């Protein structure tokens, strides 16, 4: 998938599928699938490193995981999150951070928020030839400011703000925007108001595409079960079953068998 395919898919009313990925083996699996694009999300801090929020993601962490994913991917378009405060100090610092992610293998970066400074930074990056994906609604890097993981845009004032933010990101030059944890009616209204495609997570079926976290949709963990996640596989249960089978076969001396020995 190429950058121009995002807008083309919206025009053709073909839904976009995006999935997070954080490591080489997972990327190799995705490379053999029909997934359109991959996000090395700052959710890696939680899903892989065990932190309670995405705030703990660093540029070094994002760079390392981007390199690993890029080595395994095939035709999928690769986007990497700019981590917490990665674009807030200065434009020079932002450009340097983005440069590291692009050199690691990302084809675009995703930036959370749509305040005036963020939109100016996005415009600067786009003018420099760097594709940027926006992100509005529940923005996990601002979780303390938002007061927790809550649905955004539930009242008319918040809804109007999100509509304005989406427009501002489009005007800044974003090629797409993620809408997270927003009522489905509002997400559809935002989607219809934009030329660029929207990618929803917890935003209903009316967006131009969907994104889920690898570990969530495959059932690799069961302690986090948000309403918007559908588990397409029970990987954790199958993994535990395989581990226990291994232990049993070792104890019963069924492994290694002759075919596993020299």
Swiss-Prot record:
The gene is panB. Mg(2+) binds at residues 42, 81, 112. Its cofactor is Mg(2+). The keyword Magnesium applies. It holds the Pfam family Pantoate_transf. 3-methyl-2-oxobutanoate binds at residues 42-43, 81, 110. GO terms for cellular component: cytoplasm. This is 3-methyl-2-oxobutanoate hydroxymethyltransferase. GO terms for biological process: pantothenate biosynthetic process. One of its GO terms (molecular function) is magnesium ion binding. It comes from Legionella pneumophila (strain Corby). Pathway: Cofactor biosynthesis; (R)-pantothenate biosynthesis; (R)-pantoate from 3-methyl-2-oxobutanoate: step 1/2. Homodecamer; pentamer of dimers.
């Amino acid at each position: 998938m190429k950058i121009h395919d995002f807008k083309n898919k919206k025009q053709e009313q073909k839904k976009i599928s995006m999935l997070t990925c954080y490591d080489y083996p997972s990327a190799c699996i995705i490379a053999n699938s029909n997934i359109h694009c991959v996000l090395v999300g700052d959710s890696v801090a939680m899903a892989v490193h065990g932190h309670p929020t995405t705030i703990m993601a660093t540029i070094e962490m994002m760079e390392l995981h981007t390199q690993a994913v890029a080595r395994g991917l095939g035709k999928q378009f690769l986007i990497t999150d700019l981590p917490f405060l990665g674009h807030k100090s200065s434009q020079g610092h932002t450009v340097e951070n983005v440069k590291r992610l692009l050199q690691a293998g990302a084809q675009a970066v995703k930036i959370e928020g749509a305040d005036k400074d963020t939109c100016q930074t996005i415009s600067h990056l786009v003018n420099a030839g760097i594709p940027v994906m926006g992100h509005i609604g529940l923005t996990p890097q601002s979780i303390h400011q938002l007061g927790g993981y809550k649905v955004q845009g539930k009242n008319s004032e918040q809804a109007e703000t999100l509509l304005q933010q989406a427009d501002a990101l489009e005007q800044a030059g974003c090629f797409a925007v993620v809408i997270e944890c927003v009522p489905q009616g509002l997400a559809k209204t935002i989607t219809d108001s934009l030329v660029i495609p929207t990618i929803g997570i917890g935003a209903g079926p009316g967006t131009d595409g969907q994104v889920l976290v690898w570990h969530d949709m495959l059932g690799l963990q069961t302690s986090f079960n948000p309403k918007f996640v559908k588990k397409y596989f029970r990987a954790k249960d199958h993994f535990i079953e395989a581990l226990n089978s291994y232990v049993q076969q070792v104890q019963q001396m069924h492994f290694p068998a002759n075919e596993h020995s020299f």
